[in-house]
Amino acid sequence: LVLISLLLIFVALSVVWKRRRGTIVLVTGAVFWMLGSVLPGPLVRLANDHYTAINDPRFGSRMAIVVLGGGTSYDHQRRLVPKGDAMTRIDLAASLYKRCVETEKSCFVIVSGGNPQHHEQSEADLYGSLLLDAGVKRADLILENESLDTYENARNTEKILRSRQYDRLLLITSSLHMRRAMLAFDAFGLHPQPTVAYVRPPLTWWLPRRKGWFDSNSALHELVGIARFYVWRWIGLY
């Protein structure tokens, strides 16, 4: 978590600079106060970039719909479920697939997501079962269940698409994740049409809230990931 890493940095600074410990504590408190109150909105707005609305994608005659994993978690009954807003990605993919089939177009769905949280199922396997329940045909569903990050999402999806014919590629993820995902997919020669499933609203408060820290952490995670992409690109890893 980005905020935990930031806190550890402040703790390390207070240990190294003992004479400045009081100042560091005050600065730490002020920074985390703002991260829970006034900064979530601007950070989310920056991470969202221009992906601020759920768009209606253009269809082709041969459609490839890629759904990126957004994590898994256990509900109060200890059932494994999509984490956070990930269910919106599944719902949107099922809806677009249905529209595609109704217009008698050729379409298939790729779900890309491994098991970085070490749960009983990968993201792709769990999401895939829900897409089957929503009406996606098994023959039109491809599960890519090895990716552990956005880089691997793009790399492994590109490998799958090499042997597939398509004239339109849709990429489904959240507004926060879309900018980083598009950078990764473009780097692998894929130029998908961004299709936002959920827009994170840029909310701000005067007093710190748990949701404020959550939003700040999510936005900073994406912004750090974007910065890392450009560093990796510069040194030739992408």
Stretches found by the model and what they are:
Residues 216, 227-238:
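Extracytoplasmic/luminal low-complexity segments enriched in Pro/Gly and acidic/polar residues
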Residues 12-19, 35-36:
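Structural signal for the C-terminal ends of transmembrane alpha-helices
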Residues 1-15:
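Membrane-embedded alpha-helical segments of integral membrane proteins
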Residues 221-225:
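C-terminal functional extensions of proteins
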Residues 22-38:
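Hydrophobic membrane-insertion alpha-helices, especially the h-region
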Residues 37-213:
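A structural signal for short, hydrophobic/glycine-enriched beta-strand patches
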Residues 19, 46-54, 234-238:
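Membrane-interface elements of multi-pass transporters and channels
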Residues 2-4, 19-25:
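Short, aromatic-rich membrane-interface segments at the entry and exit
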